[in-house]
Amino acid sequence: MNHALRRATLGLSPGLRASRLQQSFAKHQIPAVYRCEAASTPLQRAFTTSRCFRQETAAESEKDDAARREEQSERARKRQARNVTSGSSAQTLENDRPWHRADSGADPDAPKDVPENKDMKKGRLLTTPTRLLKLILPMPFHPEQEHVNRPVEGDVDDAGATVEPLALLIHPHQPLSYLERLIQAEIPPVQYKGREKLPDIVFRAEADQNEQDGRKDDNKKKDNANVASYSGLGHEGPTNKEANWVRWSGSTEIGDFIRDAARGREFAINVEGFDRELRVAVPSFRDRTYYMRMTLRRMSRDIESMSKVKNECDTLAHQGAHRLAQGGFAALAGWWGVVYYVTFHTQAGWDLVEPVTYLAGLTTVMGAYLWFLYISRDLSYKAAMKVTVSKRQAALYQERGFDQNRWDQIIHEANNLRKEIKIIASEYDVDWDEKKDLGGEEVKKVLEEEKQGRDGTKVTEGKDEDDGPGSSDKIKKKQ
């Protein structure tokens, strides 16, 4: 039989012989995973390696797709088994619910910004370098708890475990209803009449209602009966065990709510179906303006160092302008002396001096007129001083390495920060010690001068460039 097979093989062409041998080797020697079909090509060498790899990849992808479909079908069956409601208001089911998320696998020894679940009994409202506020809220719900009003049974492992605290970034101008939606999306639903619904969230804060309870002192004036009291201390204030609480509307802005709640140490968040309320410490004025004041202090140090260089350059520029003015007076006095000497002490006399002085005076007037056309400003001593001082200042700034653009920017930002802090201080009804954060009276004076304009080198708002008799304010007063 082997002899006959050998004769049949020798009777084939070389190309067919090679393909037949390769097929036989692939069928009997290579495992079944690496089997492939090699098309016979006459008079050509058969290459099947890349085709084998493609078939292997296709087989693996088919297996992965089959496993994925099986897993999806199994998950769908589990979801269908746990499906207890069909209402449109129901939240996502158990596997997709955010309160069932496991804690992150971070290093347990690494420092944490948020305390442990068991140690965090009260929420916190923190300020950020931006205008946003960071609300850290404890979540007293078990990871396997499906409804707020139905706690987990006692046979569950770690019955006292709770979900990790929740962090939310909110803007002071957003309403409380927006914060309510954020909290509702992160807590379990409530079971109500056999259906799931989102639990209602109520925000309550301490209120000044002593007048209604009759505990107000009779010695106080009746004029202040309808005036709310503010302290701005927040969580830094004293504890008031007999505090009066009031419910706030969801349309109230978060910033207004926090500002009013700052009269007490904390505000409360009530969740429907949960027997306890969530307390959150209220930020004080110092907390709300912490990053603003730190930024202002850093800017104040830069302003103080840059103002020294700027004052030196400005002083030298003004001294140079005054010396130039004095030099002009000396030139006029010298010209007067030359005319006097030539007229009365030489043989040239007035016949020669008269046309010379006439032409010199006319040339001076023409030059002054051309200079006025060039600068397009009022022809006055103040305008001439401005041009001279500004050019000298620019040269000195460049020589000393003073950046005028950066100076203007940092002054503008510092004044804006001062304005924002003053607004918050007025809202909290506290007195802000501006000198302490600015680093002294000198920086405050520099900011005020740069804001209002000084030395005639900066234009103030609502005024012309020259505060002379033709200024806009004086013209309005005359009218």
Curated annotation (Swiss-Prot):
A motif (Selectivity filter) lies at residues 350-358. Ca(2+) binds at E354. Its main location: mitochondrion. GO terms for cellular component: mitochondrial inner membrane; uniplex complex. Residues 55-323, 376-479 are mitochondrial matrix. The chain crosses the membrane at residues 324-344, 355-375. Pfam families: MCU (PF04678). Residues 83-93 have a biased composition (Polar residues). Residues 1-54 form a transit peptide. Residues 345-354 are mitochondrial intermembrane. GO terms for molecular function: calcium channel activity; metal ion binding; uniporter activity. Residues 56-125, 206-238, 445-479 are annotated as: Disordered. It is a multi-pass membrane protein. It comes from the Eukaryota. The selectivity filter, in which calcium ions are arranged in single file, is composed of two acidic rings separated by one helical turn along the central axis of the channel pore. Belongs to the MCU (TC 1.A.77) family. This is Calcium uniporter protein, mitochondrial. It comes from Gibberella zeae (strain ATCC MYA-4620 / CBS 123657 / FGSC 9075 / NRRL 31084 / PH-1). The lineage of its organism: Eukaryota, Fungi, Dikarya, Ascomycota, Pezizomycotina.
